[in-house]
Amino acid sequence: MINQKKIRLSGDKSISHRALMLSSISSGASQLSNLCDGADVQSTIDCLKACGAKIYKSEKSYTVNSSSLSNPNNPLNCRNSGTTMRLLTGLLAGQRIKAVLYGDTSLSKRPMDRIIEPLKKMGANLDYINNQIVLKKSSIRGGKISNPTPSAQVKSSIILAGLNGEAGTVLTESYSTRDHTEKMILKQNDNSKWEILVFSYDFKSGE
């Protein structure tokens, strides 16, 4: 016999990363409830704080106060979080931030060229040196970008970089990936005239 109990599940990790990053560049205060409380999301919180975002934790939610980010004083430690490193690189490139991002031994073995190359094509000034992403102040142009990798992390990095691009960004992906980032951006900007154009040719689960 199974006893009935109430179980509170932690929030979705992928959505938690994106909610924190988008709130960090939004005007006014954002209140986020039921965030994932895992180590990867904490890495994103710590990196955003280092870039000037004001993030406060209460018993049931987080409050994010920030309208602009600033250059961090020290390299950003993404620890073991590939989502933090890949998405944050795109976000910071679009915000014209200068930063160095690195991770632990495991993260250092994961491929980063999949974001480096498309971001460079968009105008980002960055390199991958000794397992660190070295990002200089960039002017994102936008343009037509192709993503052959079935990864929502790569797609999201491109979209986040393109938010402040000089021109629009049209992204073509070989495989359809999860659309958390697109939906959240449009939801946070209900009254805007933004459009997010992503053309997909097939379906394959992304990250």
Task: Please give the residue ranges for each predicted region.
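Structural preference for solvent-exposed beta-strand-turn elements
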Residues: 1-207
